[in-house]
C-alpha cells in the first residue's frame, strides 16, 4: 500500500506540473515531502507555516481531486503539515519529474469498460479563459474550428508550435474539452510525447503491443504535446506513423505541439515531418504588451487578487518571455503581499521581483538582437548601423528596431542611438512599418516568428 501511494504521489506531481506554472511548481510543490506510510492517507510536509497555509489555500483541493481521480478512490485523504519528515516514517523525497515512471495513462485493456476511460484533459483549460491577442489569435480561431468540426481535413493534423509557456498546452486542452462538449461520447486523449514513448516501451515489454495499438487507433481525437520528444525514438516513430495513418484515414482529429516548426525538428523521420504539414501549422508567439497586461489582469481576477492596472502594465513591460513567467510573477507578488500585509504597488513589485527583473534585463539586449538579425540575414552588424538604405539592409534594420522595441526596455531614443545615432521617429516608423508588413507579408511574419522564438529561447 505504501509503495502504491508513493507511486500515486509521483503521478499526481506529473499532472500538477502540467497544470501550473513551472515557477509555482518549483516554489510550492516540488519541495513538499510525502509520507505514504499510513493507509489511505498521504501527508505532505511543508518547510514552514507560511508554505503550509499557501499550499492548503491554493493547491490542496486540486491535489486531492487529481489523487482521487488517479486512484479511483474518493476516500483518499491528503493532508498538509508543517515540519520535516518523522524519524519513524519513510518519507519519499520528490524525484526529478523527468525520471519518474508514468502509470496513470496506460492503454486500456481490451475488456476495460468505457466508464474507466480517462482523457487526461485539464477541465480548467478552456477557450473561455484563454486570453487572446495578436500573438495567438489565429491559433485560437483554428482551435475553435477544430473543436466544432474535428477531423476536417483542412486542419488535420493541427500543428501548433512556439516557445515554452506560450499557451500551446492550454489551447490543446481547450480544443479537447471543446470536442467533448460537442459530443460527450467522443474518445479524446491528451498525452505528453514523453509519456507516449514510455507507454509504448512498457507495452512492448509486457507483450501488450496489440492492446496499445487498438487503444490509440480507436480514438476520435489524439492530442500529443511536445512531439519533439519523439526525436531519435525510431520504434515509437514507426508506431506513431501507423497510428497517424489509421486516425487520419478514419477522419479522426490529430493535434500536435512542438517548440519548433515541423521541418526544423531533428531526428524525426521525414515521412512524419511530411504528415505533420498535411493540415495546418500555426505559430504561437510571445504575447505583445497589451496581451501580457490582459493575461495578468485575467489571472488576478481568477485568483481574486487586487492588481492595479498600472502595476499590471509595469510587470507586462518588464517580463516579456511567456505566460508562465507572468503567472509565476503574479503568484510571487500575491504571496509576498499576503505574507507582509503590504499593498501591491509598483515599488512593492519592483522589490519583490528584483531577481526576475535583473535576469530579464540580461537575457535580451539590443546588441543581442542586432547580432541575431545580422546572422539571420547574412549581413554585418555594421550594416544595421550604417546609412545604407538599400532594401536588403533597410528591411532587416527595421525588423531589428521593432524587435528591440518589443523585447527590451530601451526607449525609442536609446534604440535609435544603438542603430547609428538615428532619431526616435525613425525607430517609431520602423515599428509601424514592420507591424503592417507582418499582417500583409507572410515572409516577414515568418522571419519575425523565427527571430522572436530564437531570442526568447
Curated annotation (Swiss-Prot):
Q: Does the keyword Nucleotide-binding apply?
A: yes
Q: What is known of its domains?
A: Domain I is involved in oligomerization and binding regulators, domain II is flexibile and of varying length in different bacteria, domain III forms the AAA+ region, while domain IV binds dsDNA.
Q: Which CDD domains match?
A: AAA, Bac_DnaA_C
- Supply the Pfam families for this chain: Bac_DnaA, Bac_DnaA_C, DnaA_N
Which residues lie within the region annotated Domain IV, binds dsDNA? Answer: 338-457
Q: Which GO terms describe its cellular component?
A: cytoplasm; plasma membrane
Compartments reported by the entry: Cytoplasm
Q: Which of UniProt's keywords are assigned here?
A: ATP-binding, Cytoplasm, DNA replication, DNA-binding, Lipid-binding, Nucleotide-binding
Superkingdom: Bacteria
> One MF term in GO for this entry?
ATP hydrolysis activity
What family does the database annotate? Belongs to the DnaA family.
- Which portions of the sequence form the region Domain III, AAA+ region? 120-337
Summarize subunit and interaction data from the UniProt record for this chain: Oligomerizes as a right-handed, spiral filament on DNA at oriC.
| Listed name of the protein | Chromosomal replication initiator protein DnaA
- What organism, scientifically named, is this protein from? Mannheimia succiniciproducens (strain KCTC 0769BP / MBEL55E)
Any GO BP annotation: regulation of DNA replication
What ranges does the record give for the region Domain II, renumbered to this chain? 81-119
- Tell me the name of the encoding gene: dnaA
**Region named Domain I, interacts with DnaA modulators:** 1-81
Residues the entry annotates as binding ATP: 165, 167-169
Predominant subcellular localization, coarse grouping: cytoplasm
Residues making up the signal peptide according to the UniProt record: none
Instruction: Give the function comment from the record.
Output: Plays an essential role in the initiation and regulation of chromosomal replication. ATP-DnaA binds to the origin of replication (oriC) to initiate formation of the DNA replication initiation complex once per cell cycle. Binds the DnaA box (a 9 base pair repeat at the origin) and separates the double-stranded (ds)DNA. Forms a right-handed helical filament on oriC DNA; dsDNA binds to the exterior of the filament while single-stranded (ss)DNA is stabiized in the filament's interior.
Amino acid at each position: 500500500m505504501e509503495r502504491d501511494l508513493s507511486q500515486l504521489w509521483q503521478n499526481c506531481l506529473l499532472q500538477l506540473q502540467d497544470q501550473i506554472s513551472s515557477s509555482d511548481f518549483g516554489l510550492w510543490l516540488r519541495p513538499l515531502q510525502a509520507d505514504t506510510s499510513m493507509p489511505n492517507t498521504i501527508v505532505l510536509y511543508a518547510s514552514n507555516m507560511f508554505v503550509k497555509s499557501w499550499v492548503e489555500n491554493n493547491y490542496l483541493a486540486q491535489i486531492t481531486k487529481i489523487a482521487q481521480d488517479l486512484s479511483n478512490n474518493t476516500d483518499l485523504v491528503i493532508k498538509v503539515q508543517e515540519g520535516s519528515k518523522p524519524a519513524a516514517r519513510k518519507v519519499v523525497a520528490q524525484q526529478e519529474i523527468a525520471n519518474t515512471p508514468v502509470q496513470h495513462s496506460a492503454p486500456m485493456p481490451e475488456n476495460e469498460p468505457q466508464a474507466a476511460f480517462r482523457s487526461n484533459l485539464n477541465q480548467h483549460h478552456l477557450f473561455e479563459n484563454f486570453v487572446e491577442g495578436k500573438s495567438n489569435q489565429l491559433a485560437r480561431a483554428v482551435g475553435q474550428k477544430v473543436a466544432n468540426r474535428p477531423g476536417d481535413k483542412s486542419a488535420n493534423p493541427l500543428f501548433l508550435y512556439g516557445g515554452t509557456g506560450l499557451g500551446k498546452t492550454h489551447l490543446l486542452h481547450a480544443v479537447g474539452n471543446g470536442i467533448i462538449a460537442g459530443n460527450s461520447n467522443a474518445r479524446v486523449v491528451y498525452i505528453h510525447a514523453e509519456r507516449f514513448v514510455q507507454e509504448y516501451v512498457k507495452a512492448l515489454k509486457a507483450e501488450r503491443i496489440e492492446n496499445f495499438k487498438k487503444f490509440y487507433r480507436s480514438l476520435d481525437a489524439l492530442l500529443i504535446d511536445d512531439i519533439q520528444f519523439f526525436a531519435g525514438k525510431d520504434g515509437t516513430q514507426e508506431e506513431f506513423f501507423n497510428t497517424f495513418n489509421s486516425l487520419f484515414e478514419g477522419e479522426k482529429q490529430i493535434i500536435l505541439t512542438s517548440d519548433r516548426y515541423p521541418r526544423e525538428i531533428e531526428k524525426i523521420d521525414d515521412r512524419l515531418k511530411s504528415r505533420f504539414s498535411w493540415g495546418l501549422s500555426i505559430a504561437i508567439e510571445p504575447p505583445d504588451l497589451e496581451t501580457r497586461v490582459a493575461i495578468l489582469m485575467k489571472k488576478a481576477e481568477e485568483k481574486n487578487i487586487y492588481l492595479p492596472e498600472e502595476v499590471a502594465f509595469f510587470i507586462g513591460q518588464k517580463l516579456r518571455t511567456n505566460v508562465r513567467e507572468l503567472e509565476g510573477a503574479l503568484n510571487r507578488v500575491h504571496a509576498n503581499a499576503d505574507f507582509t500585509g503590504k499593498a501591491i504597488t509598483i515599488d512593492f513589485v519592483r522589490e519583490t521581483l528584483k531577481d526576475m527583473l535583473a535576469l530579464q534585463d540580461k537575457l535580451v539586449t539590443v546588441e543581442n538582437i542586432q547580432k541575431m538579425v545580422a546572422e539571420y540575414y547574412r549581413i554585418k552588424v555594421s550594416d544595421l548601423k550604417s546609412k545604407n538604405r538599400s532594401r536588403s539592409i533597410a528591411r532587416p534594420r527595421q525588423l531589428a528596431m521593432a524587435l528591440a522595441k518589443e523585447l527590451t526596455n530601451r526607449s525609442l531614443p536609446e534604440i535609435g542611438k544603438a542603430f547609428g545615432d538615428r532619431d526616435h521617429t525613425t525607430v517609431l516608423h520602423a515599428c509601424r512599418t514592420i507591424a503592417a508588413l507582418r499582417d500583409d507579408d507572410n515572409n516577414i511574419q515568418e522571419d519575425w516568428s523565427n527571430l522572436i522564438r530564437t531570442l526568447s529561447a
